[in-house]
C-alpha cells in the first residue's frame, strides 16, 4: 500500500490532524510540533494528546508514517553560541513533544555554517545531536537533504554521511529525501539510471533502511539550480513524467511520502490525487 499525505496544519490543536489527513485522501502526515517561526514551544495538553491518539487509531494511520518537522529558527550548525544554545534547547523540547504525541520521527535541516566552514558546522551539529539524543531517548532524528545555498550543510549525501558516521547515536539517526531539494542540488531523480545510482549511493552510505521518509515536491527551478522553491505536483521542472520515474521505483514505494507543496488542505487533496493519477492507482 502506498503511504501518502501532506504537511498538515495544527492551529487549534493536534487533535485535528488524523481526521483531516483522512479527508484529503492521506494515510501519512507531517506536522510542526509548534509554531515554526517562534522560539517558544509548549508540551501539548492532555486532552489534545488523547484525542490525537484516538484519531490515529480511528483512521488507521501507521505510526511509521507520522513525522514532525523541526521549526524554522533552529540552526544547530551555527557558530553563534547564543543561537546554538537556543537551537539545542528547542530541539530537545521538540523531541519531548514528539514523544508525548507518540510520534517516533523528527525531521530536521542540518543547518547553516554561516561562513564558518562545513567542518565547523558539522562539529556543531554533532555536539547538538549528541547532547539532545542523550537527553531524549525516544525520538528518531531524520536529517533532510537540502540545497546548497546560504552555507547549508546536507546538500550532498556525503555531508549527511559525515554527520551520521561521527554521531554518538547513529542507530537513532536516519534521512529524509526531499525531491525538490535533491533535484535542485543536481541529483537527476527523473532519469531511471541516475535514480538507481542515487539509491545505490544511499544504500552504500547509510543502507536503505535509514531512508525513512520522502518529501514529495515538484520544483519551480531547473536541475542543479540550488534554489529550493517547491511547486505543486506535475506543475514544475520535475514534472509528471519525472515524478513518475521516481515514485514508480519499488524501493521508493516502500517509504511514506509527504507533500510540502504550496497551498492548503484542499490543494494538497488535489496534489495527492495527481500523484495517484501519475501512478495510475485507481
From Swiss-Prot:
Binding site for Zn(2+) 2: 144, 178, 215, 260
Keywords associated with the record: DNA damage, DNA repair, Endonuclease, Hydrolase, Metal-binding, Nuclease, Zinc
Domain of life: Bacteria
Catalytic reaction(s) noted: Endonucleolytic cleavage to 5'-phosphooligonucleotide end-products
GO MF term list: deoxyribonuclease IV (phage-T4-induced) activity; DNA binding; DNA-(apurinic or apyrimidinic site) endonuclease activity; phosphoric diester hydrolase activity; zinc ion binding
CDD domains associated with the record: AP2Ec
Textual note on the cofactor: Binds 3 Zn(2+) ions.
EC number in record: 3.1.21.2
Binding site for Zn(2+) 3: 181, 228, 230
Binding site for Zn(2+) 1: 69, 109, 144
Record-linked InterPro entries: AP_endonuc_2 (IPR001719), AP_endonuc_F2_Zn_BS (IPR018246), Xyl_isomerase-like_sf (IPR036237), Xyl_isomerase-like_TIM-brl (IPR013022)
Matches recorded under Gene3D superfamilies: Divalent-metal-dependent TIM barrel enzymes
SUPFAM superfamilies: Xylose isomerase-like
GO biological process: base-excision repair
Cofactor(s) annotated in UniProt: Zn(2+)
Enzyme class: hydrolase
Pfam families in UniProt: AP_endonuc_2
Family: Belongs to the AP endonuclease 2 family.
Function description: Endonuclease IV plays a role in DNA repair. It cleaves phosphodiester bonds at apurinic or apyrimidinic (AP) sites, generating a 3'-hydroxyl group and a 5'-terminal sugar phosphate.
Record's protein name: Probable endonuclease 4
Amino acid at each position: 500500500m502506498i503511504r501518502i499525505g501532506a504537511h498538515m496544519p495544527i492551529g487549534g490543536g493536534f487533535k485535528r490532524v488524523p481526521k483531516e489527513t483522512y479527508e484529503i485522501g492521506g494515510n501519512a502526515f507531517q506536522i510542526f510540533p509548534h509554531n515554526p517561526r517562534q522560539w517558544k514551544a509548549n508540551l501539548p495538553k492532555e486532552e489534545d494528546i488523547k484525542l490525537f491518539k484516538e484519531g490515529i487509531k480511528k483512521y488507521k494511520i501507521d505510526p511509521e508514517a507520522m513525522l514532525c518537522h523541526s521549526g524554522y529558527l533552529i540552526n544547530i550548525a551555527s557558530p553563534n553560541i547564543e543561537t546554538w544554545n537556543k537551537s539545542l534547547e528547542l530541539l530537545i523540547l521538540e523531541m519531548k513533544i514528539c514523544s508525548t504525541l507518540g510520534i517516533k520521527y523528527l525531521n530536521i535541516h542540518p543547518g547553516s555554517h554561516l561562513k564558518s566552514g562545513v567542518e565547523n558546522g558539522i562539529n556543531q551539529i554533532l555536539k547538538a545531536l549528541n547532547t539532545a539524543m542523550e537527553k531524549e531517548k525516544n525520538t528518531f532524528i531524520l536529517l533532510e537533504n537540502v540545497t546548497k545555498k546560504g552555507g547549508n550543510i546536507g546538500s550532498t549525501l556525503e555531508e549527511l554521511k559525515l554527520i551520521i558516521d561521527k554521531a554518538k547515536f547513529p542507530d537513532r539517526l536516519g534521512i529524509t529525501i526531499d525531491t525538490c531539494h535533491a533535484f535542485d542540488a543536481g541529483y537527476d531523480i527523473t532519469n531511471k539510471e541516475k535514480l538507481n545510482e542515487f539509491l545505490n549511493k544511499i544504500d552504500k552510505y547509510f543502507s536503505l533502511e535509514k531512508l525513512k521518509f520522502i518529501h514529495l515536491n515538484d520544483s519551480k527551478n531547473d536541475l542543479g539550480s540550488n534554489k529550493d522553491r517547491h511547486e505543486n505536483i506535475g506543475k514544475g521542472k520535475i514534472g509528471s513524467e519525472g515524478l513518475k520515474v521516481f515514485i514508480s521505483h519499488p524501493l521508493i514505494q516502500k517509504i511514506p511520502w509527504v507533500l510540502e507543496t504550496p497551498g492548503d488542505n484542499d490543494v494538497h487533496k488535489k496534489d495527492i490525487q495527481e500523484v495517484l493519477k501519475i501512478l495510475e492507482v485507481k
